[in-house]
Amino acid sequence: MNTLLMSLMIMIMTHEMPKLPYANNALEPVISQQTIDYHYGKHLQTYVNNLNNLVPGTEYENKDLVTIVATAPDGAIFNNAGQVLNHTLYFLQFSPNPSQSEPTGKLAEAIKRDFGSFENFKKEFNAAAVGLFGSGWAWLSVDKNGKLHITKEANG
C-alpha cells in the first residue's frame, strides 16, 4: 500500500492528545506539575492509546470522539472514549492567568438564577465532586430550557 495513503488512513483513524495551551507547571500552586504530568501525560495518553487500539475494524473506526461517546454502548470503547473526552474538556478549560475569578455575563446571570449565588454554586459543585467515590467527573451543564444543572458521573 502507498505510504502516503497509509499515513492518511492512520491520521483519519487516530485520536490524538490535545495540546495543552499552557506549560505543565503553569497552573501551580493550584495544580502541580506532577499532577499534570501524571493525569495528562500518563492517564490521558493511555486512554488515547487504548481507544486507537480498540476502534480499528469497528463501526467507530472513522468516527469523531463525540460521536463515539454518544453512540457506543457501555464497554471498553465507550469507557476510553469517554475518558479522552472528559480529560480533554478538563485540561482545556484552565488558564494560568485567568482574567477574573468569577464568571460574568450570561453565565453569571444563569448561575445566580439557578443557584442563588456564585458562592452557592461553588458549594453545590464541590459537594457533588467530593461526593464521588473513587474517580469520576462533576459537570455544570445546561438543559434544552437553559437551566443549569450539576451532574456527576463515575469513571468515564
Where are these regions (language model features)?
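Positively charged n-region of N-terminal signal peptides that target proteins for export
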Residues: 1-4
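Feature for soluble, non-membrane regions of globular proteins
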Residues: 6-8, 12-156
